[in-house]
């Protein structure tokens, strides 16, 4: 069985149709933001307290990647799944720290560019593998090998070995569009952001949303902390949890 075949079927892994997400990440706007401004990354930067000038952006992105790896608390040589890898900078960063990484994405040009970037990085063969795969359909990844959020959390739990850890940084909203009066201008803007940038959890991620999501999937010791350098104290949180 190859890594691009669903377990036991010989078929390519299932990709859930998501026109909004695919359209956004294939747009010129997406290219300008992620390729030009964020050097291929698809995540927030980490800024020290009282930082008001965000440039150069690359350093803040590297700091956030280091924070993520620290939250995983894994020894060198561990197997990591980078779900939604974009152009591969996080996978490459972790591989340079000695990790073995399976990087997945559903956008064709992301997969192509990530493979190219891995090759350019000069990493040992097989240390990073890049596949087109949907993190809501992880059937092709064997159990204990490492924008239906519930399905994704359940899938992550299944493939982790006992004692394995999940870690991510996510936005936890103090208010969503549903908290505003009908017709409110800000509510309308929030809905547009959610719809056209494929960010449906913006409508769901109230207090304890991600904690409950992880616990319902079976994770234990769920921790959530505000990174000390974050400038929006009610928005961005670090989450980590264990598979018992």
UniProtKB/Swiss-Prot annotation:
<keyword id="KW-0808">Transferase</keyword>
<dbReference type="GO" id="GO:0009975">
    <property type="term" value="F:cyclase activity"/>
</dbReference>
<dbReference type="GO" id="GO:0006696">
    <property type="term" value="P:ergosterol biosynthetic process"/>
</dbReference>
<comment type="similarity">
    <text>Belongs to the class I-like SAM-binding methyltransferase superfamily. Erg6/SMT family.</text>
</comment>
<dbReference type="Pfam" id="PF13649">
    <property type="entry name" value="Methyltransf_25"/>
</dbReference>
<comment type="function">
    <text>S-adenosyl-l-methionine-dependent Diels-Alderase; part of the gene cluster that mediates the biosynthesis of ilicicolin H, a 4-hydroxy-2-pyridonealkaloid that has potent and broad antifungal activities by inhibiting the mitochondrial respiration chain. IliD catalyzes the Diels-Alder reaction that converts the acyclic 2-pyridone intermediate to 8-epi-ilicicolin H. The biosynthesis of ilicicolin H starts with formation of the tetramic acid by the hybrid PKS-NRPS synthetase iliA with the partnering trans-enoyl reductase iliB since iliA lacks a designated enoylreductase (ER) domain.</text>
</comment>
<dbReference type="GO" id="GO:0016218">
    <property type="term" value="F:polyketide synthase activity"/>
</dbReference>
<dbReference type="InterPro" id="IPR041698">
    <property type="entry name" value="Methyltransf_25"/>
</dbReference>
<dbReference type="InterPro" id="IPR050447">
    <property type="entry name" value="Erg6_SMT_methyltransf"/>
</dbReference>
<comment type="pathway">
    <text>Mycotoxin biosynthesis.</text>
</comment>
<dbReference type="InterPro" id="IPR029063">
    <property type="entry name" value="SAM-dependent_MTases_sf"/>
</dbReference>
<protein>
    <recommendedName>
        <fullName>S-adenosyl-L-methionine-dependent Diels-Alderase iliD</fullName>
        <ecNumber>2.1.-.-</ecNumber>
    </recommendedName>
</protein>
<dbReference type="GO" id="GO:0003838">
    <property type="term" value="F:sterol 24-C-methyltransferase activity"/>
</dbReference>
<dbReference type="GO" id="GO:0005783">
    <property type="term" value="C:endoplasmic reticulum"/>
</dbReference>
<dbReference type="GO" id="GO:0140781">
    <property type="term" value="P:ilicicolin H biosynthetic process"/>
</dbReference>
């Amino acid at each position: 069985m190859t890594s691009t075949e669903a377990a036991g079927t010989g078929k390519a892994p299932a990709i859930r149709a998501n026109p909004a997400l695919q359209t956004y990440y294939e747009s010129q706007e997406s290219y300008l933001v992620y390729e030009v401004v964020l050097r291929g990354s698809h995540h927030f930067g980490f800024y020290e307290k009282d930082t008001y000038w965000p440039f150069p952006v690359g350093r803040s992105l590297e700091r956030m990647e280091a924070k993520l790896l620290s939250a995983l608390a894994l020894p060198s040589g561990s197997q990591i799944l980078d779900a939604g890898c974009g152009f591969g900078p996080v996978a490459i960063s972790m591989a340079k720290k000695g990790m073995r990484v399976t990087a997945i994405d559903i956008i064709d040009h992301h997969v192509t560019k990530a493979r190219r970037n891995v090759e350019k990085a000069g990493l040992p063969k097989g240390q990073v593998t890049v596949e087109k795969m949907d993190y809501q359909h992880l059937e092709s990844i064997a159990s204990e090998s490492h924008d239906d959020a519930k399905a994704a959390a359940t899938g992550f739990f299944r493939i982790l070995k006992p004692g394995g850890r999940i870690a991510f940084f996510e936005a936890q909203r103090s208010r969503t569009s549903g908290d505003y009066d009908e017709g409110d201008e800000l509510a309308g803007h929030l809905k547009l952001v959610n719809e056209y940038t494929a960010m449906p959890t913006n409508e769901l991620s109230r207090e304890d949303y991600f904690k409950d999501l992880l616990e319902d999937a079976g994770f234990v010791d769920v921790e959530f902390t505000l990174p000390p350098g974050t400038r929006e104290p009610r928005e961005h949180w670090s989450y980590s949890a264990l598979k018992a």
